[in-house]
Amino acid sequence: MAVSLFQGDGHGRSGVVFGVKDRMNFYAAVMDLSRQMLQVIRVVAGQESVIGQAALKPKLVDWHTLRVQRNTIISKDFIEAFFDGQLTLSVEDQALGLGQIGLVVRGTTSAQFDSFHAAPLYSHRPFSPPAAY
């Protein structure tokens, strides 16, 4: 999934939620431009855990892109977060399965979102039909 976002003044985080079972069980990938930090958070039974974080080097523009994808490589699930087109964070986690997606703002900041879209990632489907020989 990917979204363009503008984070307003104040202290807080904005981003996407995914793997949502309910309001007590989900993942979130959130950016905090005031601290220049990107975090991947796991919430299980209402308990928040930061499972990965990385420093950001934001471009001097108002709008930024945040993309998150979940990959499976040899039965290991990875969450990859991209900020402004660059892979910024990759974490391995299998605690939560698939679920709903959405947008999130936490703290005293405001945010504007645009061009939010999601698509399934098929890693085992061929890009072309089998050869005709």
Describe the residue ranges of each PLM region.
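Short beta-strand/loop motifs in extracellular/secreted proteins, especially
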Residues: 12-14, 27, 36-38, 70, ...
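Short, solvent-exposed beta-strand-to-loop segments that form ligand-recognition rims
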Residues: 55, 80-105
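Surface-exposed loop/edge segments in extracytoplasmic proteins
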Residues: 24-26, 47-53, 86-91, 126
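Beta-strand-rich interaction surfaces with strong enrichment in secreted/lumenal proteins
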Residues: 16, 28, 51-58, 91, ...
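Short, aromatic/His-centered strand-loop micro-motif at the edge of beta-sheets
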Residues: 44-67
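Short tryptophan-centered beta-strand motifs in secreted/extracellular beta-sheet-rich domains
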Residues: 1-3, 61-73, 77-81
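Ligand-recognition surfaces built from glycine- and aromatic
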Residues: 93-133
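Secretory/extracellular carbohydrate-interaction modules
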Residues: 1-43, 106
